[in-house]
Design a protein with these regions (language model features):
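Arg/Lys-rich amphipathic alpha helix in sigma70-family domain 2
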Residues: 47-54, 63-84, 93, 156
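A short pre-motif secondary-structure segment
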Residues: 114-118
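C-terminal flanking helix
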Residues: 16, 20, 42, 108, ...
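Short, charged helix-capping/linker segments at alpha-helix termini
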Residues: 2-10, 21-40, 53, 136, ...
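DNA-recognition helix of helix-turn-helix
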Residues: 67, 71, 132-158
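Pre-recognition alpha-helix immediately N-terminal to the DNA-recognition helix
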Residues: 7, 18, 102, 112-113
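Short amphipathic alpha-helical boundary/capping segments
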Residues: 1, 10, 99-108
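Short, small-hydrophobic-rich alpha-helical interface motif
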Residues: 1, 19, 23, 34-45, ...
Length: 161
């Protein structure tokens, strides 16, 4: 084994659990999709490591690679779907409690990405903006939108009044 392989193995072991956890949240808990995203993230990261400028933490850069891989897959999936067959899906709900994970999974992609990165993983708006290629104001407004949608989903009685 070469030094490069050892270094990669060390990085892989250090960052894969966090990437997988993020991928799970971004895919609404779809384990197979999350595994595919993480694998493609590592493939892409090894090809594009020269674009890592060291201006942010390596994990932040890897998270942005993962998010970009997911966005590309989402765009590709939309191109393959016939528009007339698309129907909005209501998140499943049981009578006793609304599952927070399901509520997060039901958020629109952009709002969910920012909510998860900010409120779950603790990234600040500047880092999120860099990862997603948006301005900080977009990150802030999408976070407010996500929180509002979650409040409505988790407290439907309050949303009606």
């Amino acid at each position: 084994m070469t030094g490069g392989e050892d270094a990669f193995r060390t990085l892989y072991r250090a960052h894969t659990p966090a990437l997988y956890a993020l991928a799970l949240r971004l895919t609404g808990g779809d384990q197979h999709e999350a595994e595919d995203l993480v694998q493609e993230t590592w493939v892409r990261a090894t090809r594009k490591i020269s674009s890592f400028r060291g201006e942010s933490a390596l994990r932040t850069w890897l998270c942005s690679v993962l998010i970009n891989v997911r966005r590309e897959r989402t765009r590709s999936a939309w191109r393959m779907v016939d528009a007339p067959d698309i129907e909005p899906a209501a998140p499943p709900r049981d009578d006793s409690a609304f599952d927070l994970e399901r509520a997060i999974a039901a958020l629109p992609d952009g709002a969910r990405d920012i909510f998860v990165l900010h409120d779950v993983y603790g990234y600040v708006h500047r880092e999120i903006a860099e990862m997603l290629g948006v301005v900080e104001g977009t990150s802030k407004s999408q976070l407010a939108r996500a929180r509002s949608l979650l409040r409505r989903a988790l407290n439907p009685d309050e949303a009606r009044s």
